[in-house]
Regions:
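Active-site bordering "gate/hinge" segments
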Residues: 1-168
Length: 168
């Protein structure tokens, strides 16, 4: 059972779903629950540095990303998608035997989607980067990948139906 909102209204529904799920279990294996006190591998938290940068710096980065994407080729006629987002998450595992483990992490996601055009044909390309460090966002790589993906589709056509030799 999964929910993104845990409140009194959803609690009854979640419990009913859980009971229905339990009825579906056909395994005869005995379940084992880990207790607290056991030794577990340390998994470090990963904290992004995006909080150290102003909104103006982030907007400037996106404007630069769009400008450089458009400059790749005159066939790149517009950037249909240029996005930056920040994510912070915490994963926690708890049970009734005292186990309580957690890990938190945060990162940025940057995506660009250029539109290429030639004659009456258009094509979109997309590429992105997931990175915990703002200054390490791989703008040049995503520009290259996204524009190459869009440009590579131009001039493509359909193959006439028929029998063709296949080499292995």
């Amino acid at each position: 059972v999964y929910t993104e909102t845990l409140d009194d209204d959803t609690m009854e529904i979640l419990l009913q779903q859980l009971l229905e799920n339990v009825k579906l279990i056909s395994s005869t294996e005995e379940e084992f629950m880990y207790a607290s006190g056991a030794t577990y591998q340390e998994v470090p938290n990963l904290e992004s540095d995006y909080k150290n940068y102003s909104t103006a710096e982030k907007v400037a980065m996106l404007q630069d990303l769009e400008k450089k994407t458009l400059a790749v080729s005159p066939k790149i006629v517009k950037v249909g998608y240029c996005q930056y987002s920040e994510t912070s998450q915490k994963v926690q595992i708890m049970n009734s035997k005292g186990l309580d483990l957690s890990r938190s992490y945060s990162y940025t996601t940057t995506i660009v989607g250029p539109l290429a055009a030639e004659g009456d044909q258009t094509a979109m390309g997309f590429a992105g980067d997931i990175n915990p460090f703002f200054q390490q966002i791989e703008k040049d790589r995503i520009i290259k990948e996204a524009t190459e993906a869009a440009l590579a589709q131009l001039g493509a056509g359909f193959v006439k139906t028929g029998k063709y030799p296949v080499s292995c």
